[in-house]
Amino acid sequence: MDKKKAAAQSRAGKVEKTRLKIVEAAAACFIAKGFHQSSMRDIATLAGVSLGNLYNHFENKAELINGLAELEAQENAVLLRLLEDTGSPTSTFHTFIERYFTMVRAPDNAALTAEIFSEAMRNDAIYQIFDENRQSLIQALNGLLIAGQKAGDFKSDPLIPSLTPLILDLIEASALRIALAGGEGAKAEGKLLQSVIDLWVKA
């Protein structure tokens, strides 16, 4: 490999690592202090970078929100790959519900989700950023439900795929409630969640 090319790749890797460190620090600050109470200096200090270095990567907290959305997209990529497995629609569907419920109810994820939801209600640009990730999940889950209908696993009702946003809403609301309760009752809640959603869609 050309030395200049190798050096450029090394620099790019360092930049990406620094950006990730800053975004993770921003997430920690938002969870601990809230979006508005967290300053760029707070984030720089937690990330272990100078304030000037932080501004080299992100001009403001809105850009940091974009970084958080990118991290969420990376987490969701695992779920999207799962939903592509239409060989056994019911099994894939149940696995998705379990994994998404577990992911959302994780204490840090739940706290950050609540903070972002609060800010998104006041800032449409932030809402749009995270809605893109949600729409990707909706489309992938729609595809699984349609595959399940063709396989006879799910009800043939043409309205079934339109339930996808409601399914995500139910999982998220249930997960956040469990997170608020400190995780108590998570196992029972997960089973109940599966049963309720099965009533909606299973043939």
Which role fits each region the language model picked out?
Residues 67, 81-110, 160-167, 190:
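Hydrophobic alpha-helical connector segments
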